Amino acid sequence: MSDDDFLLRLEAALARHTGKPAKVHDLQRLTGGANRTTMSFDVGGADPGEPRRQCILQLGTQTFDSVVGMVPQITPAEQARVMIAAARVGAPAPRVIAILEPADALGEGYITARVAGETLGARIVRDERFAAARRVMARQCGEILAAIHRIDPGEAPFLMRQDAAAHVAAHRSIVDNYNFKLPALELALRWAAENVPRNQRLTVLHGDFRTGNMIVGEEGIRCVLDWELAQAGDPMQDLGWLCIRTWRFGGAGPVGGFGSREDLFAAYERASGHPVDPAHVRFWEAFGNVKWAVDCLLLGTRGIEEVGIERSAIGRRIEEPLWDFFDLIESRE
């Protein structure tokens, strides 16, 4: 498809979904890969004097691996539906303008309003302009996660449901099927299987709530991005994933590189009405490192087949999350 044809189809899709004539300006590709593309653009109406709206177009296809498919992943249309549900309960999700349909002839995807701000983790946890934001972000994370966990699972019946034991078993199967042989990883998976927490609630989860997947301004968190791993499961999983060292980007705070666990837990308890057991979250923080270690191996394996080196470089980092896992369970942090 030529660039001109793509532009015409995008304008037609906007007009179809909004009921208004649309003129697209400044279409730019922000990221692109084999299965996912993000573009930004401005849209105006028929009147040249009409204010433009800043938008984001997400295009993607769901790839299926019979082994990796045992862990949650949803389609672009399903992501958009979860974001709509999240916004209804007060979570700062992108405002969905349109969910693409076959008649739009653009592929799978959705269009949202664009939110200004910073997403790069290293800047968020280090730049002086975000110093005030860092003081409130752990509290904001607790409040946002409490809101996400209030989503009615009935609004997203397509979400995979997995408790902690199922997550551990799925990653055990991935390691076995890909024939990854690392003694440290074997020991970590055994620890996880033997320490599955009891009394797990079932809620909708973001699935990848962390620094780097949120838009931040000087006042704090403006928007939560990257909902493709949304699922139904133990809500403490979201809290633990936010705390793993990888997502601190060199920042000092154990929560995302910017805050304390105490602030996160207290805010979550106030907003949700549910108590937080630090040991329960600690399991998910520890197992989060195991999951990331498995992801590093998977990305490294796929990187061998690609031209770029980014995935291969991630594959070489497997020792980091495994070190963090053992450091955490031995309580040296």
Where do the language-model regions lie?
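ATP-binding pocket architecture of kinase catalytic cores
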Residues: 28-164, 168-169, 173-188, 195-201
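Activation of the activation-loop gatekeeper triad in protein kinase-fold domains
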Residues: 225-230
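Catalytic-loop of the protein kinase fold
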Residues: 204-206, 211
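Juxta-kinase regulatory segment immediately upstream of eukaryotic protein kinase catalytic domains
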Residues: 1-20
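Active-site activation/catalytic loop segments of kinase-like enzymes and analogous catalytic loops
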Residues: 238-273, 287-306
